[in-house]
Amino acid sequence: MKARTAGFPGVEVATLLAPGHDDLTGPFWTAWPAEPLLLIALIAAAGLYGLGCYRLHRVVGARAVSSSRATAFFAGIITVALALLSPIAVYSERLFFMHMIQHLLLLLIAPPLLLLGRPLVPSLWGLPAQWRVVLGQLLVPGRPLARLGYLITTPLVAVAAFVITIAVWHLPVFYDVAQGRTFMHDLEHLLFVGTALLYWWPVIHPTGGQRRLSYARALPYLLPPFLESMLIGVLLTFADRPLYRTYVDVAMPWGFTAVTDQQLGGLIMWIPGGLFFLIPLIGLLMALLRQEDARAPGSPPTASRQPTS
């Protein structure tokens, strides 16, 4: 498909309304996808959050939303844009390893950043007052919507949804179907982001209050996707033939073959993908050991100190 010009000299905008781009002869940074609806949605989400932060600041003061949380949320929005609205999205249709980079951004980077911003309250405050009241009532604990939200963010449900989603969409039959049909590809990305938000929810706990995952429970919670990422990465890295038909008969840029491209994609999923779980696992293990040391007989009674008034 011919690339379209967006009115900027030297910048090509590849249309993603149908699969397959033939114009990848220019520099990497010149291939930009045309996704106006997604761009509008991301701008709207950022604007809603920003407006809510402003209103909360006027009502509550500087304590409403910290700058670090706001920065995390906007970084999450930028990460989604980087995955879906940058040359990465265009080149992911030709290069498997680019698609794996896109998946890492959507699964392991953007969702935690969005949740670290604690987006629920600021986003509600970004809405008109009438809408805020209606949605606030729906989210009152005990209401059906609140119960559903509690159910789907329970650790067992969240980790199962996350692991199954990753496994299914990396099976060759589903992967090739998604790459060949725009609707299925969009559905894949939607499920990636949605289940990733569910998965990271119990870890980050963006609503405050009592945590649902202790350090001891968080360790086994992080293991299934860590092992899954390692396994899929190893299988892709050491496969001696292309596993996905999508990349067999396409002209690959930069001198890649289907096998070398797949091997690099496997390494990306194996090593960087594994590190995104391994680093939190090590951090949780160290925190758990410190917690156990504090409980050991003869340890300093720091936990019993009372705050001064």
Predicted feature residues:
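Alpha-helical membrane segments of multi-pass proteins
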Residues: 2-309
